[in-house]
């Protein structure tokens, strides 16, 4: 008999103001396996990486993500860079990176291998209109429309 184990896909990100680009990304990631787990960046991590706090706190971002049909579970990450301990606990078969995430796939694979994980790391392409599928662009448009 074959294994009944589901293929687990893990993605991570800020997911601050959810837009169609996020939904397309999550849909494509879900198509890589049976189960999709999202790691939401901790508020401190967002502030450090982007130079500003997120618009929405991690708990709210997680709640919105849980409502998206492609997402099976959501975990809030720890402050700082990617937690290899958290990834080890989640036991992914695949990690899907977004097109704008600045991780090197091969470097990430090496780090995962060093802790005993043989995980496929895949970079997904932009699936939606690049100029409309970025939170920073949405914030710019909001300030242009409402702050003039």
UniProtKB/Swiss-Prot annotation:
Required co-factor(s) are:
a divalent metal cation
Query: What Gene3D superfamilies does the record point to?
Result: HUPs
PANTHER family per UniProt: FAD SYNTHASE (PTHR43793:SF1)
Q: Name one GO molecular function term.
A: ATP binding
Keyword ATP-binding attributed:
yes
NCBIfam families xref list: cyt_tran_rel (TIGR00125)
In the record, the note on similarity to other proteins reads: Belongs to the archaeal FAD synthase family.
Q: Which Pfam families match?
A: CTP_transf_like
Q: Under what name is this protein listed?
A: FAD synthase
Query: Which InterPro entries does the annotation name?
Result: Archaeal_FAD_synthase, Cyt_trans-like, FAD_synth_RibL, Rossmann-like_a/b/a_fold
Flavoprotein keyword on record: yes
Provide this UniProt record's keywords sorted from A to Z: ATP-binding, FAD, Flavoprotein, FMN, Nucleotide-binding, Nucleotidyltransferase, Transferase
Q: How does it assemble?
A: Homodimer.
Task: Give GO terms for biological process.
Answer: FAD biosynthetic process; FMN metabolic process
Positions that bind ATP:
14-15, 19-22, 100
Q: Which organism is it from?
A: Pyrococcus horikoshii (strain ATCC 700860 / DSM 12428 / JCM 9974 / NBRC 100139 / OT-3)
Q: Which pathway does this chain act in? A: Cofactor biosynthesis; FAD biosynthesis; FAD from FMN: step 1/1
Q: What does this protein do?
A: Catalyzes the transfer of the AMP portion of ATP to flavin mononucleotide (FMN) to produce flavin adenine dinucleotide (FAD) coenzyme.
The reaction(s) annotated as catalysed by this protein in its Swiss-Prot or TrEMBL entry are: FMN + ATP + H(+) = FAD + diphosphate
Entry's EC annotation: 2.7.7.2
């Amino acid at each position: 008999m074959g294994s009944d184990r589901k293929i687990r896909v893990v993605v991570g990100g800020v997911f601050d103001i959810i837009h169609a680009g996020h939904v397309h990304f999550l849909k494509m990631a879900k198509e890589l396996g049976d189960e999709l787990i999202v790691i939401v960046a901790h508020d401190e991590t967002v502030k450090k990486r982007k130079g500003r706090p997120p618009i929405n706190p991690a708990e709210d971002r997680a709640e919105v993500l849980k409502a998206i049909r492609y997402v099976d579970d959501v975990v809030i990450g720890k402050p700082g860079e990617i937690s290899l301990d958290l990834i080890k606990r989640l036991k992914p078969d695949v990690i899907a990176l977004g097109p704008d995430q600045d991780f090197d796939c091969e470097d990430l694979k090496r780090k995962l291998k060093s802790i005993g994980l043989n995980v496929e790391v895949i970079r997904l392409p932009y699936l939606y209109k690049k100029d409309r599928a970025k939170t920073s662009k949405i914030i710019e448009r909001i300030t242009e429309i409402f702050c003039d």
